[in-house]
């Protein structure tokens, strides 16, 4: 009789194990540590996936297999040409252009701290901004133009290499490389910005508002997101998927037409996001050292925990979604998407309320502006809530215990 009770108790324990959620460790393909005493910040992958560069106190150039190609200089802001043959970097007031093999091509020191930079896909033009200034250069480092009247948030050189997109505290505008305006929308503050490789569509994210423009400055649609404010923006190279990281710990994903596809919860502020073509791999890094990976449907594929908080521009993914690269202060991590297995659907698909998204037939823009550098105050520590038992488990447990008691009598 006692033996039978022991069998029942063992069976109960087995059911507990089956019903409890299992967290599978994700093993990186490779890990490249920072040099002793150095800290890393930021990572960039070239459009063709041939160049991977991590920034910080010392740049580390890596192959897709994680091999160290070279190390040199320092740079907290990074950008590459489409083919990875040119790497633009900046730290403090210094901007450098280096070749994909690590050779210094030129270096310039400005009289302000650089807060953003951009390089044309074919490397034909370069732009840097900071402290109310913007400067444009040729590939050889020759000065094209400068302007000290714009309080700039972010800049992107258009894919043609002939124009530059600028967001400020008062507008979004496109100028030529001599900084003469081509078009502008002065209706409101504009912040984060991304462009498709073909340059046909432009996406901006400011606070809780996401907008899409055509290359000619026509406003296609506006979507108001619920919850917090945008801290990060990613736009798939094929134009299919838009990802916004928010300060309310959510990741919000939109389709090309502005429809909100889904919202997922993380556990802290989302400070860096990346998305592959088709949105099949979506990566979101948060301040609590966690990196969340989702598919296009909003299913959480897994969570990878690093040693330090995820800073802006610290997660990246190849266009095909097969390789994910993450940087914290201590190391660069390369992960295969195939190492993440579906675990749960984070939140149900959320239909877009018609009152939230506004589609605009055609609106031409016409320009000005105060510096704002985004700072991230340290959020309070969060605790990971313990998962409750699935509903059938308590019923099974009670039944087995009653059976055990009955057999004892």
Give the location of each predicted region:
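A cross-kingdom C-terminal cell-surface attachment/processing module
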Residues: 391-407
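Hydrophobic core register within WD40 beta-propeller blades
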Residues: 43, 78-80, 117, 155, ...
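Blade-level signature of beta-propeller repeat domains, shared across WD40, Kelch, NHL, RCC1
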Residues: 304-348
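Hydrophobic beta-strand positions that form the internal "hydrophobic ladder"
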Residues: 51-52, 87, 126, 164, ...
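A short beta-strand motif characteristic of beta-propeller blades
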Residues: 28-34, 67-72, 103-108, 142-148, ...
């Amino acid at each position: 009789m006692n033996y039978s009770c022991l069998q029942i108790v063992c069976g109960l324990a087995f059911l507990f194990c089956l019903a409890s959620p299992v967290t599978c460790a994700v093993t990186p393909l490779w890990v490249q540590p920072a040099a002793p005493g150095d800290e890393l910040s930021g990572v960039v992958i070239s459009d063709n996936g041939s160049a991977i560069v991590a920034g910080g106190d010392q740049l580390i150039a890596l192959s897709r297999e994680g091999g160290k190609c070279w190390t040199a200089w320092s740079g907290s802001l990074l950008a590459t040409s489409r083919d990875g043959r040119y790497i633009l970097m900046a730290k403090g007031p210094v901007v450098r252009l280096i070749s994909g093999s690590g050779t210094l091509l030129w270096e310039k020191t400005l009289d302000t701290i650089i807060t953003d930079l951009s390089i044309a896909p074919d490397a034909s033009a370069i732009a840097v901004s900071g402290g109310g200034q913007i400067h444009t250069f040729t590939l050889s480092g020759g000065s094209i133009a400068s302007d000290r009247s714009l309080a700039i948030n972010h800049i992107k050189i258009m894919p043609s290499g002939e124009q530059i997109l600028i967001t400020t505290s008062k507008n979004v505008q496109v100028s030529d490389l001599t900084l003469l305006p081509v078009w502008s929308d002065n209706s409101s503050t504009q912040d984060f910005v991304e462009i498709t490789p073909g340059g046909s569509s432009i996406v901006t994210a400011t606070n809780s508002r996401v907008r899409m423009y055509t290359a000619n400055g026509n406003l296609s649609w506006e979507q108001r997101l619920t919850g917090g404010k945008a801290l990060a923006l990613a736009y798939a190279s094929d134009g299919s998927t838009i990802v916004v990281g928010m300060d309310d710990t959510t990741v919000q994903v939109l389709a090309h037409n502005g429809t909100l596809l889904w919202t997922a919860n993380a556990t802290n502020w989302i400070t860096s996001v990346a998305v592959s073509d088709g949105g099949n791999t979506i990566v979101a890094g948060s301040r609590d050292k966690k990196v969340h990976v989702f598919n296009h449907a909003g299913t959480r594929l897994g969570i990878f925990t690093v040693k330090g908080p995820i800073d802006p521009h610290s997660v990246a993914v190849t266009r095909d979604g097969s390789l994910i690269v993450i940087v914290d202060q201590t190391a660069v991590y390369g992960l295969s998407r195939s190492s993440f297995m579906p675990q749960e659907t984070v939140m149900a698909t959320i239909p877009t309320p018609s009152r939230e998204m506004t589609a605009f037939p055609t609106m031409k823009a016409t320009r000005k502006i105060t510096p704002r550098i985004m700072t991230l105050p340290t959020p309070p520590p969060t605790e990971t809530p313990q998962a409750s038992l699935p509903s059938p488990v308590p019923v099974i447990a009670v039944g087995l215990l009653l059976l055990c008691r009955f057999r004892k009598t």
